[in-house]
Amino acid sequence: MKEKDITQKVLEDNNDIFADIVNVLLFDGESEVEENELVNTTVHSQYKAEDGKVHEQERDIAKYWKRGGTDIVLYGIENQTKVEKRMPARISGYEGASYRGQCDKKTIVPVITMVLYYGTDRKWTAPKNLKSLIKVPDNLDKYVNDTKANVFEIAWLTDEQIAKFTSDYKIVANFFVNKRKNKD
């Protein structure tokens, strides 16, 4: 695990920061998610690869948004400092494991993964949906699920977007915007 990744995870795992990120990036700054409504959940899951070996995958952060004791959404955050060309496939694995983990519950809630891209040299250039990574015969296209990568380019946020942050994440976002603008 990279040191910078640990620092990002520790910061974003704070409920006030996590709620602020969700509120600004998904709800345009509206206070939909309160920090006391977020509950950590497991970030580890396993899968058996085609080689027959069992592998573990680890999300960066995963939290349930609960209101009145009821699960509303499971949010996941993935931090990226470099463009990951197979990100939609990775997200499909994370989200599939999250849905599978809910199968024994009374209700299944949506899983939303947010990719926070911290690159400052270039914008995200990789595919943002699964079908862009794979060749699907036309006659099968309607049967293939198309996982989407919700990529947020932090270094390219506007001043208006950054102004909507109310937590210390505003400092982080400003840092990456300034780093991109002032390469020196």
Q: Locations of the language-model features?
A:
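Conserved single-residue anchors adjacent to enzymatic active/cofactor-binding motifs
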Residues: 1-184
